[in-house]
């Protein structure tokens, strides 16, 4: 029996976040998952990142909506999508976002899986690109059809409550007491909850546009 998120110390709302189900041909080929089907949950990206924040939640939702736009009612194919990050890997939170995108899509940079055998089957290497000419946070392109989209994100539509600003200032300066730190953490996760539960399908938070990348 699978433990619920709160049983592992996670906030209960993590289980309310949308899930992302894909088929991974490599997982099927190697017998890692029945029919290659893998379902990702928000808890997976929290484990990957080691934390939960608006950026991690936004990256998860961008991957979700990007794949929905590319595949429609089809099940997305992990490892068959290229991801194009607008900024350099060391710029701001680009590294955090790209890590989440890599987990979900399988697209990797130069350290990715080079492929199986002489035919390099199921290769994921160099499917993740930085510094791309993208009008959005990131772009995604199907390798089989060439269909491409850009994905945009604006977390300003889910603002911090007024109470948070002084708490954040004290917490980041390592000057908050235990009660203030507890409240800070509650408000921090409440914003994440709003994004994942109340705004998950709100096009003001995450929206997708068709894209025609340069050859």
Residue spans for each PLM region:
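Non-transmembrane, aqueous-exposed alpha-helical and coiled segments at domain scale
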Residues: 1-52, 61-215
